[in-house]
Structures are given as structure tokens and as C-alpha cells.
Amino acid sequence: MVTWLALSLTALASVSSAQWVKGKAFDRIAIIWLENTDYDLAAGDPNLAWLAKKGISLTNYFAVTHPSMPNYAASISGDYYGINHDDMVNIPSNVSTLVDLLEDKGISWGEYQEDMPSVGFEGKAYKNPKTGANMYVRKHNPAVLYDSVADKQDRLARTKPLTQFKADLKTNALPQWMFITPNMTSDGK
């Protein structure tokens, strides 16, 4: 089971100067996946419980297959294209994604990836040079799996390290749709 939180961050709505499109049910969503734990454990964590009170938790959400990467691929395109591994893939640019739908409607989007070493990083993984810990992995970054994002610099620039979240919040630049991925240590294990 994939455990995740979706937050309707209406409190942030008034502080963003990024392009804004009024939503029917909510104006902003932040999706945070905690894939390697049971829902009850994640919901019982005091920090996550506090965060869940700020928005909504989707409790009937399940993986489409195993291992990880096909689920991340499906999260923004609705299909996993028969992927049954976590190896490096590049899904062709003719495949439509949520990014296309959001941009067609003028809705801002972005990803924040914990321990991703730089904006638009496309490598398979990033290990902490001090500890050797495998912190960031591409298989958990849905947008860069698609050539329609990875091959376009303006789109690739919207995939950022999580450290950029605070700066974007401070400068009123948070997008309306956000996908936030914890690193391999913090993903709910």
C-alpha cells in the first residue's frame, strides 16, 4: 500500500504570486508520498498528524503494481506502461501527462525532491558524499521519467530540491500543484 497525504493548502493561497487559477474544490494541492509504511503508522506520527489537519488525507489510495517506479510513473499519466522494474527509463514525449493538462489550463506546477542535488537533476541517484547514504533516487521523481519534461528546460526547471520549497514559499512562488518526495531515509520506512 502506498501511504500519502494530499494537502489543500488554502492558507497559502493568499501568499503566492505565481500564476493562479481558481479551483472548483481547492486552489492548491501538495502531494506527499510515504510509500514504505502502513497508513496507521504514518497517521500516528505527530508531525504528519499535524500536517494532515492542514488539509486532507486520501485513505483509499493504493499502488498499481510493484516495485516503486511504475507507481510514480502512473501518478502523473494514469498508466505504468508495463514497467516492472526500478531501472532507468525515459517515457517518450508523445505520452501525455498531468503536466500537459496543468499547463493547458494555465495551472502552475512543480516538484520538490528531498536531497536532489540540483534543480532539474536527471541522474539515477544521488548519494550523500559524507555518509554514502543513497538519499535521492530518480525512480521517485515522476516528472523526469517523461521526456516531455526531461527534454524541455523550462519544465525540467520545475523539478527542484526540497530545500527550494522554503525559498519559494518566502518569495511567494509556490506552484498550485506540487509533488513532494521524501528521500530514501524519510519515505516512511
Language-model features, listed with the residues they occupy:
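Fungal secretory targeting signals
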Residues: M1-A18
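N-terminal pro-sequences and low-complexity stem/linker regions of secreted or lumenal proteins
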Residues: A18-K189
